[in-house]
Amino acid sequence: MNTLQRLCVVCSKCNECAMELECLKYCDPAIVLVDSAPFKRNALTVVHLYRRLCPALAEQNARYQASLITLYLEMLLRCLYEDVLLVDEALGEFERHGDRQRYYRRVLRLDRCACHDTLEVTFTERIRLTVDVATLNEVERLLCKINCVYGVLEPTRGLELCRRLLSLMGRLCGISPVAAPEAYVENLTCLQCYEELAAVPNQGRSILKRLRGLLCDHLTVRKSLVQLETGIQTMEQDIVETVGSRPRLSSLLELLKGLSSSAAVSHAYISEAEDTLRRYNLFTDIPPRIYSLSDFTYWSKTSEVIVQRVNVTVQQLNMYHSLCRTLRNELGQYLYGDRVEDLFTLSEAQLGEDERLYVGSIYAAPERIVDLMTSLSLQSFENNPVFNKLHENNEIYSKIRSLLEEIRRPLDGAGTRGAAAATAAGARGAAEGTGGAAAAGGAAAAAGEAAGGPFQCGDPAARAHDVVREVHVRKKAYLQKVSELGYNRVMQCIKGQEKLIKKLVNVNLLGTVCFEVLAKVINGFIRRRAYLERVDGVVDVDRLLQYDDHLYVVNNLVHRRLPAESLPALGQEFYRFVNGPVFQHHADRYPLPYNIDMAYACDNAGMLPHLKEDLVRLAEGTVAPSEWMVAPYRRFFDLGAALDLNELQKGFWAHVREIVFSVALYNEAFGKELRLCRADEPVDEERERLVVTYNVDGPLFLYAGGGVWKSKDLYLLLYQHLNGAAAPPPPAAPSPPPAEPATTAGASRKRPAVESPGVLLDLVRDADRESSLVPDCLLYDP
C-alpha cells in the first residue's frame, strides 16, 4: 500500500468518525453521558491525528503540491478537532446545568454565524478589491474569477487568498458530509454545469438562457434515501439483535409494517391483462384481440398520468411518525430508563397535520414525501374539465376491461366480427375523445333545420351548410387544443417544481468541484512562487547586459513582418498564456483548442462582452511588430501604473501578446527553435525554452546550453540566447570600472552605455561600426 492509499484509508475513517460525531450532536445529551466511553476514545484518536497529520498536510498544501484529498483531509481534521473539543465541553456543562436547549445551541453554534467572510484581493498597491463570500456557489465563482486574473495576481497573495477560502469552506461545510441547506444555493450553476451544456447542441439558445433555472448537482450531489419498507425491515432486525423479542415492541413493529404495506387502490384488470399476455411469446399465434390488449396495456403504462398514486397519505405519514416516536420512547425506557428527548422532539408538539408534510420526518424517506407533495399538488387539476387528457387513462382501462371480457366469453363467427367491430370502434373512440357531444349537437342542428330556421330561405348553398355543426366542431377542436397546451404546460411546470423539491428535501452530499478547482489554482501559484525563490544557478541577465543589447534585438525585429498565415496559431498561443490553470481541456485525450479553454474561463468568471472583444482583438494580432512592442525596458509585467482592474488586465494581455509574437518573429528571423512555456505546466527538460512566470520580480527564465538566466526584459534574454548561451561561470561581485585617463583620442574611447536612445548613432553597437549590416547614415559622426 503506497502513501496515497494510506491517506485514502485515513480519510475514509475520518469521514466515518465525522458522520457519527455529527449525528451525536442531535442526540439526547443525557443518553450520551450514560455511555460516553466510545466518544472519548474517538476524541483522543482525532486529537492524535490532528497533531500528527494536520501540520504536515498544511505545509504540503501551501508549499509543495495540493490535491483534492489533501485539501479535504486538512479541512476535515481541523473541523473534527474543533468539534470534539466543543462537544466535550458542552457535555461537561450539560452535566452541571441539565439544560438541553442550552446544550443544543452550544454544539450547533446557533448563537453565532461564521459562514460569512469578506476577502480582500490585492493586485497592486493601487488596486484592492473586497469580495463577500457566504456560500459554496460564491466560493466556486470567486475561484473562476481568480483563474481569469491569474497572471496579474502575485503568487504569495494568491496563496494567502486560497488559504482563506479553504478556511471558509471548513466553516461552511463543517464535519458533516451532508451539506447544510444554508451552505449552497441550488439554482445557481457551476463550471461543470456550463461544461455539460457546452457539450450538447444549443438549439439556437444562448448559454445564459440555458443555464437559467438549471439545478446544480455538482457542488452538492443529491442522494435518494431508502423507502419506508426497507427501513422497517432493518429496524426490526436491529431491535431483535439488541433487545430481543418483546411483546410491546413487536406489536409496534407489526403496526408499522401494516401501515407501510398498504397500497393504493389499483385496477385489478391490469394485472389480469398482464397474466393473459404472459401466455404469448414470439413463437405463438397472436390473435387480433391479444394484440389490441397488448397495445392498450402498453399505452396505459407509458402515458403520462397526472394524479400519481403513492403508497402513503398525509394521515399515514403522521401515523407512521407517531408510531416510530412511540417505538423510540419504548426503546429509550428499556435501555436507559428514560424517554428520549433529542433536538427533533423539542418543537414537535407545535406542528399540525399539514405542517408535518412541509417539515418532513426523520423516520420517512424524503423521496416518499416528495411523491406525496407532488400527488397533492396535482390533484387540484383533476376536476378541471378543460384538461380532457385526464380522462384518457380511464378510457384505456375500459378498453382493456372490454377486451378481457371478450377473451373470456366464447365467441362464434358473428361474435368475432362484432368483437372486431367493437375493437375498431373502441380505437376510434379513443382517438376521437368526446365526439358524441359533437354528434348530438349536429343532430340538434338538423332537427332545427327541419322545424324551420333563419337559413331555410335565401341561398341554397347557405342552407346546405350546417353552421351550428361547424361551430360545435370548431369549439371541440379549440377546447382540445387548449386542453393539450394547458396540459403540457402544467406537466412541464410540475416536473420542474418536483425537481426543485427533490433537490431541497433529499440529502445533498458535499461535492468535489470546489476542492478540485482550489487545488489547481493553489498548484499554479506554488509553481510560480518556486521561480521567485530560486536563486542557486540562476544568472540575472539585467546585470550582465546593457540597453544597447536590448536595442540590437529590437532593431533587428522591428523592421520585419510575421507571416500572415502564422497569426491563427499565434492567437492560440496567446490564449494559452492568458488563461489560468483551471480549464485545461487542451490536455484531454481528445484535446480542444486553447480558445475554448479561454471561452470557458471568461464565461464562468462573468467577463463583460466588451472586455471579451478587447481580448479577441489582441489575439487576432497584426504582422507589424511596431503595434505589439509595448513593454518598457526591463519592465515586463510591471503594471503598477494601472488605475483599475480593467486597465491592469489589458496591460497584462498586451505584454503576453508581445512575448508570444516577438519570440515567434525571433525564431523566424534568426532560424531558432526557442520554445515558450508556462511556469505551471510540465516541460521537456532537454529543449531550450523560455519560461513565463508572470512575476514582476523575475517574469522570464531562459533555459539554454545547460544554464539558467532570468530577466525583466524579453529582448535581453533573446540577445543572450542569440549569442549562444552556455553554462555561465559563478557570478562574481561587480567591481567598479577603472578610471580612464583623459585623452584627446576620442575615436579609441568606448561610448558609455545609455539607458535611453538620444540620437540615431546611439542605436549602433561599437563592434558593428565597420560592419556592412549597418547603414552609412548611422555611422556619420559630425
Curated annotation (Swiss-Prot):
Which compartments does it reside in? Host nucleus
Which region ranges are annotated with the description Disordered? Answer: 727-754
Look up the coiled coil feature and give its residue ranges.
none
Name the positions where ATP binds: 666-673
- A GO cellular component annotation in the UniProt record: host cell nucleus
Q: Which GO terms describe its biological process?
A: viral DNA genome packaging
Q: Which Pfam families match?
A: PRTP
Recorded GO molecular functions are:
ATP binding; zinc ion binding
**Start and end residues, zinc fingers (C3H1-type):** 190-218
Going by the UniProt record, its keywords in alphabetical order are: ATP-binding, Host nucleus, Late protein, Metal-binding, Nucleotide-binding, Viral genome packaging, Viral release from host cell, Zinc, Zinc-finger
Top-rank taxon, per record = Viruses
Where is this chain compositionally biased, Pro residues type? 727-740
What protein family is recorded? Belongs to the herpesviridae TRM1 protein family.
Q: How does it assemble?
A: Associates with TRM2 and TRM3 to form the tripartite terminase complex. Interacts with portal protein.
Protein purpose: Component of the molecular motor that translocates viral genomic DNA in empty capsid during DNA packaging. Forms a tripartite terminase complex together with TRM2 and TRM3 in the host cytoplasm. Once the complex reaches the host nucleus, it interacts with the capsid portal vertex. This portal forms a ring in which genomic DNA is translocated into the capsid. TRM1 carries an endonuclease activity that plays an important role for the cleavage of concatemeric viral DNA into unit length genomes.
Q: What is this protein called?
A: Tripartite terminase subunit 1
Provide the species name: Tupaiid herpesvirus (strain 2) (TuHV-2)
